[in-house]
C-alpha cells in the first residue's frame, strides 16, 4: 500500500484490528515506530513503522530468542513458555541509539535490546534487577530511569551503562493502587512534557472494567497526583480501552494510543486525539470517551507500506533467483524456539515443509508450528496440505491456534489417510487456564480423505465477539469444487494460558513415531468485508 495522503484521513477504531498487545509508540522525525509483545513466538519483539499512525509495516524482529531454555525450546512434555516469554516492550530513541526494554516472566529477567538502526541488527543484554511492565525514560540531562511494577509503582534510576540501578540514585515508590482493586496499576509509560513528568498506567478498579490513569509530578522525586483519564469500552462488551501512552505529530498535535481486549482476536491498538487541560492532565478523545472514528495526520511515503499479514511464505530471494533458506515473510512467527533441522523452504520449491522430530501428545507440544495473526472481524485462511509422506499417528493441518485450540488435519491411521477436526474443549469463557497441556485432542468429526493432498480452509469469525472458527475442505486437484464443511463451529476464547489472540497455525506432530513429512503450499490469507482502519 502506498501512503500519499495530503489531507487528514478518518479511520475506524480499532485502527489495527489484530493482536498487537502492549503497544509502545514513539516518533522520530516524521516517522512513527511501534514495539509490541510477542510472548512465546519467535522471532519476537516486533518493530513496526508507520507514517500516519494507522498503516503499519514490520521492519524488524528485535529479538531472536529470549533464552535458550527447555521451556523456550518445548523440549519435554509439561515444559513450555506459553503466555510468558517477551512481555510489554518499552521503545525509546536517545542520542542515536534505539532501545527496547522488556521483562520475561519465565526467566524472571529484564533485557535491554539496542540498535543503531531500528531495522537492526539488534543486540541483547540482561539487566540487574527485574522490572515488570517497565517504561524506559531518558531525561533532558541524559539520565535514564525506569518506571515499573504491579499495583506498587516504582521509579529507579539506571546507571550510565544501563546495566542496572544507579548506586545511590533515585529509587522510590511513586504510587500505590487501592488494595481492593481487581488489578492494580501496571503497563506504565513515563514521559516529560512542558517540564512535568507523566506516567500513563492502567488498572481494574474494584467492580469496574479496565481504565487508564495518569500520574503527574513536577519532579521525579516529588509527589505524583493521579487521575482517571479513560473509562470507556468503545461500546464493546465492557472491554475497557487502556494500557498505552501518548505521541505527538510533527505539527504538534497529540494522540493517545491504547490497546483493547477484543475477545478471541486478542488485544488490539486504538487511537484517539489528545490535548492537555489547563491543569496539565491529558484530555482524551471526547471527554474521556474513545471516538469510534479518528482523524489521523497527513502523511507522505514514497515507498509502498508492506502488509502486516499475507499469503506468501518467502521474504526474499538471493542474487541467483533462488530462495534464501529460513527467510520467511515477517508476518510469520514460530511457536517457541525453532528446531531448524525440521523445517525448510527449499526442499520442495514453493512449499513450507515440516519434518516430525519428536513424539507429542497434542498440538501444544508440536515443534515448529508456523503462525500468523488473525484479523477482525473475519479472517479466512486456506492451504494445500500434502500428507503423502505422513506416518501412522501423524497429524498435519490448519489450526485455530490458542490454548483451547481446534484444527482440521490430515492424519494417517493403519495406512489410510483420514481427514479430521479435533479440539481442546473450552471449559468456560473466563480468561483463566486449566493448565492442561498434555491431554490428547478430542475428535469432533472424521472421514476418509479423498486423496493424500487436500485443500483446507478455516474461517475465523470475531464479529461482535462471536469468536467461532469453522473448517472446510475440498480436493486439491479440483479447485472449482465446492467447499465442504467438516465438524461443528469451535469457540476461540482468549485465555491467559497463551495470553495472545487466536492465530492461524500450520503444524505437524507425531503420536507414534518420528520421521513423517508434511508440505504446505498455496497458502491464502484474506479478510472479507474488513473496513479500513487496520488493513
Question: Residues of each region from the PLM?
Answer:
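Carbohydrate-active catalytic/glycan-binding domains of CAZyme proteins
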Residues: 1-535
Amino acid at each position: 500500500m502506498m501512503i500519499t495522503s495530503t489531507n487528514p484521513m478518518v479511520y475506524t477504531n480499532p485502527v489495527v484490528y489484530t493482536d498487537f498487545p502492549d503497544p509502545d509508540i514513539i516518533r522520530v522525525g516524521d516517522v512513527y515506530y511501534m514495539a509490541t509483545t510477542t510472548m512465546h513466538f519467535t522471532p519476537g519483539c516486533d518493530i513496526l513503522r508507520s507514517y500516519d499512525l494507522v498503516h503499519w509495516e514490520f521492519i524488524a524482529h528485535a529479538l531472536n530468542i529470549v533464552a535458550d531454555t527447555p521451556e523456550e525450546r518445548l523440549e519435554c512434555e509439561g515444559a513450555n513458555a506459553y503466555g510468558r516469554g517477551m512481555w510489554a516492550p518499552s521503545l525509546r530513541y536517545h542520542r542515536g541509539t534505539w532501545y527496547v526494554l522488556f521483562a520475561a516472566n519465565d526467566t524472571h529477567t529484564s533485557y535491554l535490546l539496542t540498535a543503531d538502526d531500528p531495522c537492526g541488527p539488534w543486540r541483547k543484554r540482561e539487566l540487574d534487577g527485574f522490572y515488570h511492565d517497565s517504561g524506559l525514560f531518558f531525561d533532558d540531562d541524559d539520565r535514564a530511569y525506569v518506571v515499573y511494577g504491579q499495583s506498587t509503582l516504582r521509579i529507579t534510576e539506571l546507571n550510565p551503562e544501563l546495566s542496572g540501578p544507579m548506586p545511590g540514585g533515585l529509587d522510590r515508590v511513586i504510587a500505590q493502587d487501592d488494595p481492593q482493586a481487581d488489578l492494580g496499576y501496571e503497563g506504565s509509560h513515563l514521559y516529560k512534557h512542558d517540564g512535568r513528568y507523566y506516567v500513563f498506567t492502567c488498572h481494574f478498579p474494584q467492580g469496574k472494567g479496565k481504565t487508564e490513569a495518569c500520574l503527574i509530578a513536577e519532579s521525579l522525586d516529588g509527589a505524583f497526583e493521579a487521575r482517571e483519564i479513560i473509562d470507556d469500552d468503545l461500546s464493546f462488551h465492557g472491554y475497557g480501552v487502556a494500557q498505552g501512552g501518548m505521541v505527538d505529530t510533527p505539527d504538534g498535535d497529540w494522540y493517545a494510543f491504547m490497546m483493547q481486549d477484543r475477545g478471541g482476536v486478542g488485544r488490539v491498538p486504538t487511537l484517539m486525539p489528545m490535548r492537555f487541560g489547563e491543569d496539565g492532565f491529558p484530555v482524551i478523545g471526547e471527554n474521556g470517551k474513545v471516538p469510534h472514528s479518528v482523524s489521523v495526520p497527513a502523511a507522505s511515503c514514497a515507498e509502498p507500506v508492506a502488509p502486516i499479514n499475507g499469503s506468501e511464505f518467502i521474504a526474499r530471494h538471493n542474487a541467483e533467483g533462488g530462495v534464501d533458506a529460513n527467510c520467511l515473510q515477517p508476518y510469520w512467527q514460530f511457536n517457541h524456539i525453532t528446531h531448524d533441522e525440521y523445517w525448510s523452504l527449499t526442499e520442495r520449491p514453493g512449499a513450507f515443509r515440516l519434518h516430525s522430530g519428536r513424539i507429542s501428545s497434542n498440538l501444544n507440544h508440536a515443534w515448529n508450528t508456523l503462525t500468523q495473526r488473525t484479523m477482525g472481524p473475519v479472517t479466512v485462511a486456506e492451504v494445500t496440505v500434502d500428507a503423502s509422506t505422513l506416518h501412522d499417528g501423524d497429524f498435519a493441518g490448519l489450526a485455530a491456534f490458542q490454548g483451547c485450540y481446534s484444527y482440521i488435519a490430515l492424519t494417517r491411521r493403519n495406512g489410510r489417510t483420514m481427514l479430521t477436526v479435533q479440539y481442546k474443549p473450552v471449559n468456560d469463557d473466563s480468561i483463566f487456564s486449566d493448565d492442561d497441556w498434555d491431554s490428547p485432542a478430542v475428535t469432533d468429526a472424521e472421514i476418509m480423505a479423498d486423496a493424500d493432498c487436500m485443500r483446507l480452509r478455516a474461517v475465523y469469525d470475531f464479529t461482535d465477539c462471536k469468536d467461532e472458527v469453522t473448517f472446510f475442505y475440498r480436493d486439491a486437484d479440483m479447485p472449482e469444487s465446492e467447499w465442504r464443511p467438516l465438524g461443528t463451529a469451535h469457540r476461540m476464547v482468549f485465555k491467559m494460558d497463551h495470553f495472545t489472540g487466536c492465530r492461524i497455525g500450520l503444524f505437524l506432530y507425531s503420536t507414534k513415531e518420528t520421521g513423517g513429512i508434511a508440505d504446505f503450499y498455496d497458502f491464502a490469507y484474506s479478510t472479507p468485508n474488513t473496513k479500513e482502519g487496520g488493513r
